[in-house]
């Protein structure tokens, strides 16, 4: 299998940002992806996307642009799915 690396910039859609509920949904999806995924805000230090505490600690608000990176088989597909999750408004 071929190792691939992918990166996406995504604008956060949830009205209240990545608070507990959307952060939990996102972190669980990142964990279920089975490959390493990181999330970073404003070009800062990347956090493990599968860690709900790491995601919440970034203080991501609605409209923030974040960078997702994944490394492994299916990285493009994984980031497509995670990007859709982050762009959706889970507070609607």
What is each stretch, according to the model?
Residues 11-60:
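Compact, glycine-rich, soluble single-domain proteins
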Residues 2, 24, 28, 75, ...:
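Long, contiguous binding/interaction regions
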Residues 1, 14-17, 88:
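Intrinsically disordered, low-complexity regions enriched for glutamine and histidine
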